[in-house]
């Protein structure tokens, strides 16, 4: 019996040695690693550095020739091995152009568009999620701009610049700008001479982008309190009607012209010639007025009869990466470069008079020392970010019809807004 036990013990010991040898034996021969994923979904390296694809070359669409020429020089200085070409394509045209040119391989890798196109482009699959830099965008840009480039909880663009409308005044004609529309009406009663085409204040009066603030200032919430619910258009609200009714008084007492005459050209010509004391426009007019030699200032829009200033819409220009790019990492690096590099932001300021959407960018000396940009920054922070849901594109046409009908005295605010609301919801059914 003892002999059997001894034999079993020896067998068990041998088996244990074999098992240990198997565990501690040489590793299997290495296999070929899988190819690197170069798609836009690839996370950055552990050190946070995004490495562009080998052999990358890029195309950018933007709408300013002076900017386009110099941005290539700045890019080449930092990324000499990634050729960049730039084509002049408008920010209002780039979304539809990428839909056509992207699938053919003729589109840009990176393009700039207004933020109301971001949700549409994301929904239709024409732009990439900026997943490589989403944390950076959420922490380094102003909140309104972050919301403007977000869709379904994801980031789809770099915010570039922020804009809204303000009141410009000619210092040769105005000592101290008015602070209320009641004061403006008193000034207009003395200044206006329609026969001589003299008006106290001019603006693109029947463009909803300009008119909306007066409705917003009376408490109207476009698409509800969070501005993202297409079922809460709100044109049937008392606040919307009250705001539009006040707006009509400006046609009667400040700018008594037909809607067809309240144009950009009229505003720009009269102020640039020194004939108009006040105009309502945005930072895009600074260069024209400066080149015209006008000594002007910028002030907030006057308070309405309820003691509140118009709640204007702010817009954000955004830098998007095409879903059709062959080089998503390089393209995202270009988008980041355009939106955050101090030299690029200075170029944006010098060529377009635009305010950066970057928190640190707004602190750069050339912004901080410019009183016009400081005024724009205050106005932008007080403005309502233009709703960024796809249904926003269905708002403009009926909204303008309502404003024109009231401005020209063809309908009451309630009638005009009811007709506009019906057209809006009918258009959603068609697009679905």
Name the predicted role of every residue range.
Residues 43-49, 114-166, 176-187, 193-196, ...:
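Hinge/lid segment of periplasmic solute-binding proteins
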Residues 118-126, 143-182, 204-229, 313-322, ...:
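Periplasmic solute-binding protein
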Residues 9, 20-119, 135, 305-307, ...:
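Conserved N-terminal structural module of periplasmic/extracytoplasmic solute-binding proteins
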Residues 52, 148, 299, 349-401, ...:
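Long, aromatic- and glycine/proline-rich binding clefts that accommodate carbohydrate-like moieties
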């Amino acid at each position: 019996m003892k002999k059997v036990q001894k034999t079993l013990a020896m067998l068990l010991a041998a088996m244990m040695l074999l098992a240990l040898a198997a565990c501690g034996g040489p590793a299997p021969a290495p296999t070929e690693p899988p190819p690197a994923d170069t798609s836009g979904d690839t996370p950055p390296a552990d050190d946070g550095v995004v490495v562009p694809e080998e052999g990358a070359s890029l195309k950018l669409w933007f709408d300013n020739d002076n900017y386009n020429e110099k941005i290539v020089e700045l890019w080449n200085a930092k990324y000499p091995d990634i050729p960049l070409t730039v084509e002049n394509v408008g920010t209002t045209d780039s979304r539809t152009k990428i839909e056509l040119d992207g699938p053919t391989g003729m589109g840009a890798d990176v393009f700039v568009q207004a933020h109301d196109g971001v949700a549409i482009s994301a929904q239709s699959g024409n732009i990439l999620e900026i997943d490589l830099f989403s944390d950076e965008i959420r922490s380094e840009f102003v909140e309104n701009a972050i919301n403007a480039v977000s869709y379904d909880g994801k980031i789809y663009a770099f915010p570039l610049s922020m804009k809204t409308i303000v009141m410009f005044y000619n210092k040769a004609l105005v000592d101290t700008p008015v602070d209320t529309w009641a004061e403006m009406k008193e000034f207009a009663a003395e200044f206006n001479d329609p026969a001589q085409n003299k008006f106290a204040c001019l603006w693109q009066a029947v463009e909803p982008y300009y008119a909306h603030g007066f409705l917003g200032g009376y408490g109207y919430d476009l698409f509800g309190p969070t501005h993202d619910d297409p079922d809460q258009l709100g044109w049937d609200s008392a606040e919307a009607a009250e705001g539009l009714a006040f707006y009509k008084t400006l046609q009667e007492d400040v700018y008594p012209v037909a809607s067809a005459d309240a144009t950009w050209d009229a505003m720009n010509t009269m102020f640039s010639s020194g004939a108009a004391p006040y105009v309502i426009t945005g930072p895009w007019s600074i260069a024209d007025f400066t080149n015209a030699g006008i000594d002007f200032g910028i002030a907030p829009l006057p308070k309405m009869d309820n003691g509140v200033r118009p709640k204007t819409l702010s817009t954000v220009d955004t830098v998007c990466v095409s879903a059709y790019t062959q080089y998503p990492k390089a393209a995202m690096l270009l988008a980041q470069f355009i939106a955050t590099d101090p030299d690029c932001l200075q170029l944006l300021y010098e060529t377009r008079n635009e305010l950066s959407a970057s928190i640190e960018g707004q602190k750069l000396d050339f912004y901080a020392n410019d009183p016009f940009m400081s005024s724009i920054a205050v106005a932008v922070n007080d403005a309502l970010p233009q709703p960024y849901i796809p249904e926003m594109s269905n708002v403009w046409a009926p909204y303008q019809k309502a404003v024109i009908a009231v401005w020209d005295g063809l309908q009451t605010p309630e009638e005009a807004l009811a007709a506009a609301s019906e057209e809006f919801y009918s258009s959603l059914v068609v697009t679905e």
